[in-house]
UniProtKB/Swiss-Prot annotation:
GO terms for cellular component: cytoplasm. The gene is fusA. SMART domains: EFG_C, EFG_IV. CDD domains: EF-G (cd01886), EFG_III (cd16262), EFG_mtEFG1_IV (cd01434), EFG_mtEFG_C (cd03713), EFG_mtEFG_II (cd04088). This is Elongation factor G.
Amino acid sequence: MAQDVLTDLNKVRNIGIMAHIDAGKTTTTERILYYTGVNYKIGETHDGASTTDWMEQEQERGITITSAAVTCFWNGNQINIIDTPGHVDFTVEVERSLRVLDGAVAVFDGKEGVEPQSEQVWRQADKYDVPRICFVNKMDKLGADFYFTVQTIKDRLGAKPLVIQLPIGAENDFEGIIDLVEMNAKVWRGETKLGESYETVEIPADLADKAAEYRNELLETVAESDEALLEKYLGGEELSIDEIKAGIRKLTVASELYPVLCGSAFKNKGVQPMLDAVIDYLPSPLDVESVKGHVPGHEDQEIERKPSTDEPFSALAFKIAVHPFFGKLTYVRVYSGKIESGAQVVNATKGKKERLGKLFQMHANKENPVETAAAGHIYAVIGLKDTTTGDTLCDPNSQIVLESMTFPDPVIEVAIEPKTKTDQEKLGTAIQKLAEEDPTFKVKLDQETGQTVIGGMGELHLDILVDRMRREFKVEANVGKPQVAYRETIRKKVENVEFTHKKQTGGSGQFAKVIVTVEPLVDAEDGATYEFENKVTGGRVPREYIPSVDAGAQDAMQYGILAGYPLVNIKVTLLDGAYHDVDSSEMAFKIAGSQALKKAAQAAQPVILEPLMAVEVITPEDYMGDVIGDLNSRRGQIQAMEERSGARVVKAQVPLSEMFGYVGDLRSKTQGRANYSMVFDSYAEVPANVSKEIIAKATGE
């Protein structure tokens, strides 16, 4: 089975499968692996035995958390699939896998259409400009409606779908698809052995008109993409299948439209045509623009690397997983050049040398060792010590840093403490390993209580991390109540705040004087929450002490001024100062910088910010009033109401602090008939009465 890596990159596809929870993403991946001959037994998510869900908890919860990269072959082409999680708490995983993909298959639930989470993942894919094809899954489900789903792609995603298949029958009678490119029907008769064989037949008479109508739309769209085709089409000539496919491919690769296919992965119908579409329409590594980066240490000097083995080696580490036998596995996407296993490379992001141990192409949880890694492919590497996600590996003689990925700050925190002394040490190791794998998982020591506090993107995110500590690292820990990650900021600009740090106790003293202006930082580039500008002239503060003032200010920001929450969105400008030949030191200026910031911030109308969540509740109409009333009582702001397949959808912005335990309340108010999803939206100022409570609680008054 172990076929070698293909050298012809035209025949390689690096794709992801993205979807809402339960739209059937993992099942779809499983079927792909089955038909491409990698898997000998079809795994069902229902039995908890699917190949890509390889962590215990994923099997238990039936959701995919870590994206395993899987390689398979189809008709002489190689497909590298990265399974992405659809649950919002794992957005960092999704973003990270999108970064290294060339194309994606968006799986939608044929009954629900575009759901909130699929919308979010879609927006993330837009950010990285990933070409996509859409697969409308679960066509065998009660209430499945292909045309409704296509409409939601237009309405909710604002995207342009291009229908290239129509379903034959629906729900229990779903038996196949009409291929609008080849103008024939493919049907899976009866319970054929796992749907491997399908028959190509004529289009059923009752669907002929509909097929003709959609075929015309398809031809018009394709013809408009190319002058030569347009002339041919307007002249009444037939376009050949190859011409149509080339036209669709061109539009898809340019992300101008998204071909839509349909099927039922669970019932094994429509999977092979989807694989054909992946090869026909999604880009190969050669169709994608050259990857851009910069010279290490000089962000303004841009360089690019073409996806060719003749270029110097460069690769991006996009995932780290702990493997039971090999220890740390680093997944990398090679963008240029090639390299042997055992070779030495440089981690340009950190400026450290690394040696590549063994190289593998992964198949979910089985490994296929390879000797060399070449451009355009995805590998797992053993033996990298200092490399974390988002780092660039490259040729020591020709260094490049591929853009780094920026990760969101955690919105929820819990205190965690080991149950016994022996757990104490293990907890440290466990937290460190998990933080390496997941940059949105943050850890800090609470100075006042001495507790370890972990932060993440949501309750589920932290639940799963604590669960992994128990299973993988055998750490028993007590977890406190979730705490909201508040922030502090200032509202007005305060100029020329002066602070002098003086200490004279015999021997050399300490002396530093700084004058700063502190102001709110608005719309910073790349989401930065702090900026430092130096405007000192004439050496009144020596050059070597300026970074110390900056460091001192950043230190003070960690601990806030109102209630001990970190200060954000602040710009500090150092205007002037004074120093003493003997008594000045880096330490003295650090203290001065820190105290000056505190003094300025207190005068700058400080306020507390809280995370607001975008909440979407789907409820039967009878409970609409209760749901809205409840959201209002939680300080929620209702933003929109709409109807979706017979139910009502309420969209609101609600402070995270008011959303704890919402699951239970919503169930009891609606007899379990409503469900909701929430994602972090933004930080906003807290009302005065709430602010008083937070400060009182923090200062213990």
